[in-house]
Every structure is written in structure tokens, then in C-alpha cells.
Regions:
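N-terminal soluble domains immediately following signal/targeting peptides that reside
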Residues: 1-63
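Hydrophobic alpha-helical transmembrane segments in multi-pass membrane proteins
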Residues: 60, 64-233
Length: 233
């Protein structure tokens, strides 16, 4: 039987819940289940070869952007359409990457903590803000990198929420944190590359590239605003 094959009682309880044999009676049981599931994942990770763990966390970071992180995708696209000049885009993406890497690390070690219910609406507002700036200003403003850095701190907390839920084994903490962050960066890079290819395919004449900026930004901002309002209801 399954019970006999479980070396840890928590594994049996988790399995029974997932099979629908046990139900949540209150929030405490739900919280205990989540904690047990996290401990189970950590036990399984500890038993894996190091390279396999690295692969799993790079994959998890990438998938947190593509296909799961539509909010982060829209934010990165907002940066892309803010300036189709490589230098300006590079400065913004670097500021965003540096910022979210800082808060991701701080949150992972427990120095920074903010409820996801607070972080998510602010992330949605960051999408709206970037889209609004794209629409109102022809050129990127001088303070834009600082604003993007601030928003990156928020997005890092969003990344950390998933990582904290997933669990990090203590003996591989730093390497797996870096692996997850690498996956996130690869996801962002993939978004930018795909966007660049599509824009080049749609608008062969480089002089027409700015024609996409305002309509694309309005669409991005509208989705961000909808999500923000929805998160408050």
C-alpha cells in the first residue's frame, strides 16, 4: 500500500490531500499542508544530484517569466517599447535586473518580507506607470532608470514569493538562488529577443518603429490597470 511506502508521515498526508481523501477544515490545516509540502520538496531536493537541482531552479526561474509571469512579461515589454535604442534599453533592463536580484536575495534569506497581496497590486501599478510614461514622453526621462530600479525592487519581492514557497535547501542555498535568478534573466532575455524579432518582422523600415510605441503602451497599460483594479476587488 501507499502508506507502507511512505518513510515520512507528512508524505502520506500530502498524498491523501492531493488524492482528495483529506480536506481542509480551516486555514490552519491549509497552512500546515503548505509547510509540509515545502518540507517534502526540500527533502526530495536534498536527495538529488547537484546539477539536477541547478537545472530545476533555472527552469523554475525561466517558467516564472515564460509562460507564467505575464505581469513581468508586460513590464519588460513596456521597457522595450519605451525606447527602441539599444543603449537606453540596456540601461533600463540592467537597473531592473540589479534591483530585483537584490530584493530576491534579501527576501530569500528572510531580511525583507512583504505580503504578496500588497506586492501584486504595486507590480500592476508599475506596469501602468511605465506604459503611461511611454505614452506621454517622446524620449525617456533622466530619472527613468531610477524609477525602473524602484520597480525592480517590487518585482524581486514577487519572484521571492514563489522561491520562498518552493523552498531552498540550506546546503545549496546560494547556488540554487543564483540558478533561479539566472532562469529569470533568461526568461526576460527571451521576451526581449522575441519582441525585437517581431518588431523587425512587422516594421521593416526602422523609421516606423516608433509608431508601435504608443498603441503598444496603451494596450500594456490597460491590462495593467485592469489587473490592479481586479486585485483590489
Amino acid at each position: 500500500s501507499f502508506t507502507a511506502n511512505c518513510h515520512n508521515p507528512e508524505d502520506f498526508v500530502i498524498s491523501e490531500i492531493e488524492r482528495g481523501q483529506l480536506n481542509f477544515e480551516n486555514e490552519q490545516i491549509a497552512a500546515e499542508y503548505g509547510a509540509a509540502l515545502k518540507r517534502q520538496r526540500i527533502r526530495r531536493l536534498n536527495a538529488m544530484p547537484w546539477l539536477k537541482k541547478i537545472y530545476i531552479f533555472i527552469k523554475a526561474g525561466f517558467e516564472h517569466i515564460i509562460p507564467e509571469g505575464l505581469d513581468h512579461i508586460l513590464f519588460v515589454l513596456g521597457l522595450f517599447f519605451s525606447s527602441l535604442k539599444f543603449r537606453s534599453l540596456l540601461i533600463q533592463v540592467t537597473a531592473f535586473t540589479l534591483a530585483h536580484s537584490i530584493t530576491l536575495a534579501l527576501a530569500a534569506i528572510g531580511l525583507v518580507k512583504l505580503q504578496l497581496s500588497v506586492v501584486e497590486p504595486l507590480i500592476f501599478l508599475s506596469i501602468v506607470w511605465v506604459a503611461l510614461e511611454n505614452t506621454l514622453f517622446k524620449q525617456t526621462t533622466k530619472w527613468r532608470p531610477l524609477v525602473i530600479f524602484s520597480f525592480g525592487l517590487l518585482h524581486g519581492l514577487g519572484f521571492a514569493a514563489l522561491l520562498t514557497e518552493y523552498g531552498l535547501p540550506k546546503d545549496s542555498f546560494i547556488s540554487l538562488l543564483l540558478a533561479f535568478n539566472i532562469g529569470v534573466e533568461l526568461g526576460q532575455l527571451a521576451v526581449l529577443v522575441i519582441a525585437f524579432i517581431l518588431v523587425r518582422a512587422i516594421l521593416i523600415n526602422s523609421k516606423n518603429k516608433n509608431k508601435l510605441k504608443i498603441p503598444a503602451s496603451i494596450a500594456i497599460g490597460s491590462v495593467g490597470l485592469f489587473w490592479f483594479i481586479e486585485s483590489l476587488i
